[in-house]
From Swiss-Prot:
Species per Swiss-Prot/TrEMBL record: Streptomyces fradiae (Streptomyces roseoflavus)
Keywords, comma-separated and alphabetical: Disulfide bond, Hydrolase, Protease, Secreted, Serine protease
Functional summary from the UniProt entry: Broad substrate specificity.
Protein name per its UniProtKB record: Serine protease 2
Entry GO CC: extracellular region
Length: 174
């Protein structure tokens, strides 16, 4: 499974995988949104929940918005992002976004969308006391289910989809 593809929570709910990562000890994890991993500890790669992705290894939300799922099968951890046109992009490193940078976002509801970074270190109040700070702000659209998906530029990982306003028909901020 690659970045941007759908992941399914035990008991219901769908998010998107951001990037597959490896620890210094060689363990592989799926990186996604923390508001996703907080709702379930077991995750699957299919909606019928017959193909196990793995179990939650950690969640940081609110404050931050990221979570780690330990892969049950390390060979399933694809180092690419799915571009929703039948092809994939190799991700070879991580970097820091900058204002004006052209970026792409891959997610399981709306696929691949492009735009620019419009701000850094943004803070968003999602309500109910859920405040997340240190975010990259873009003019790339997103919709529910895109959460956790990959934000990247070329072969460089930049971040994960946390949330946004608007949608991919009329546009929005993510």
């Amino acid at each position: 499974i690659a970045g941007g593809e759908a992941i399914y929570a035990a008991g219901g709910g769908r998010c998107s995988l951001g990037f597959n990562v490896r620890s210094s000890s060689g363990a592989t994890y799926a990186l996604t949104a923390g508001h996703c991993t907080e709702i379930a500890s077991t995750w699957y790669t299919n909606s019928g929940q017959t193909s196990l992705l793995g179990t939650r290894a950690g969640t940081s939300f609110p404050g931050n918005d990221y979570g780690l799922i330990r892969h049950s099968n390390a060979s399933a951890a694809d180092g690419r992002v799915y571009l929703y046109n039948g092809s994939y992009r190799d991700i070879t490193g991580a970097g820091n976004a900058y204002v004006g940078q052209t970026v792409q976002r891959s997610g399981s509801t709306t696929g691949l969308h492009s735009g620019r970074v419009t701000g850094l270190n943004a803070t968003v109040n999602y309500g109910g006391g859920d405040i997340v700070s240190g975010l990259i702000q873009t003019n790339v659209c997103a919709e529910p289910g895109d959460s956790g998906g990959a934000l990247f530029a070329g072969s460089t990982a930049l971040g994960l989809t946390s949330g946004g306003s608007g949608n991919c028909r009329t546009g929005g901020t993510t």
